[in-house]
Amino acid sequence: MSVEQHRKEAPKTVRCMILTISDTRTYDTDKSGALIRELLEAKGHQVTEYQIVKDEYSQIQHWLKVAAGRADIDAILLNGGTGIALRDTTYEAVRDSLDKEMPGFGEIFRLLSFQEDIGTAAILSRAIAGVRDGKAIFSMPGSTGAVKLAMTRIIIPELGHVMREILKDR
């Protein structure tokens, strides 16, 4: 079956949790979380939960576990904490929670970042995606430019298709 056929069979609405990983952002100042919500809802997806989470491994793991156990969440979208600073723990928390990794997400994100946005600074990004307990997980940097790139060029175009693949054998 072709990719186009898969996309035709994919769910049109995906129920999403947004997690902004930050020690400083608030609901009033979180432009990236707001942008994720706006882009998802513009394409007919639902945001069922939105949280700002401290950039601490245990806190991120906690929210991934909560989301994995909820029937009203299909996908988890994280932004922030993907760099190489000591406090950046999102990559490790997500990686350690995945049943299956989708390495192509990070690879394509860094390629597009290099080509269209930040040049060689793309090597600092540790964007990651995968599957846990039947939920798609996408983790991207926290800048609005990175969020827009990841959402419009990768996540939104493939979200339904990813969910179709996750759910087809269940």
Curated annotation (Swiss-Prot):
Intrachain S-S bonds: none
GO BP of this protein: Mo-molybdopterin cofactor biosynthetic process
UniProt entry keywords in alphabetical sequence: Molybdenum cofactor biosynthesis
Record keyword Cell cycle present: no
Cited SMART domains: MoCF_biosynth
GO cellular component, one term: cytosol
CDD domains the record matches: MogA_MoaB
Key word Repeat present: no
InterPro entries (UniProt xref): MoaB, MoaB/Mog-like_dom_sf, MoaB/Mog_dom, MoCF_biosynth_CS
SUPFAM superfamilies noted in UniProt: Molybdenum cofactor biosynthesis proteins (SSF53218)
Pathway: Cofactor biosynthesis; molybdopterin biosynthesis
Function of the molecule: May be involved in the biosynthesis of molybdopterin.
Family the UniProt entry places it in: Belongs to the MoaB/Mog family.
Stated name of the protein: Molybdenum cofactor biosynthesis protein B
Species for this entry: Halalkalibacterium halodurans (strain ATCC BAA-125 / DSM 18197 / FERM 7344 / JCM 9153 / C-125)
